[in-house]
């Protein structure tokens, strides 16, 4: 028996221009960078930016704090 997550048809695609209609970033607009159909989420350029702490590696002996976009739910965006 398979217990997978149902793939949802979304109204936005990669490279679409969208506007955020709900949440902390309401009113911001940007381009869709990535779509996650199984989770119903999208990553929008310049929206929902969070800080990510990276461990020290050979390339970065000090480690780093990187700001990057995180996914938001597709119901919180509309095409613009």
Swiss-Prot record:
Keywords: Ribonucleoprotein, Ribosomal protein, RNA-binding, rRNA-binding. One of two assembly initiator proteins, it binds directly to the 5'-end of the 23S rRNA, where it nucleates assembly of the 50S subunit. GO terms for cellular component: ribonucleoprotein complex; ribosome. The keyword RNA-binding applies. Belongs to the universal ribosomal protein uL24 family. GO terms for molecular function: rRNA binding; structural constituent of ribosome. One of its GO terms (biological process) is translation. This is Large ribosomal subunit protein uL24. InterPro entries: KOW (IPR005824), Rib_uL2_dom2 (IPR014722), Ribosomal_uL24 (IPR003256), Ribosomal_uL24_CS (IPR005825), Ribosomal_uL24_KOW (IPR041988), Translation_prot_SH3-like_sf (IPR008991). Gene3D superfamilies: 2.30.30.30. Part of the 50S ribosomal subunit. It comes from the Bacteria. The keyword DNA-binding does not apply. PANTHER family: MITOCHONDRIAL RIBOSOMAL PROTEIN L24.
């Amino acid at each position: 028996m398979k217990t997978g997550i149902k793939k949802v048809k979304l109204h936005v695609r990669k490279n679409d221009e969208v506007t955020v209609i709900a949440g902390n970033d309401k009113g911001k607009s940007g381009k869709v960078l990535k779509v996650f159909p199984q989770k119903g989420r999208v990553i929008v350029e310049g929206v929902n930016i969070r800080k990510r702490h990276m461990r020290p590696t050979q390339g970065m002996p000090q480690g780093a704090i990187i700001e990057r976009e995180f996914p938001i739910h597709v119901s919180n965006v509309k095409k613009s």
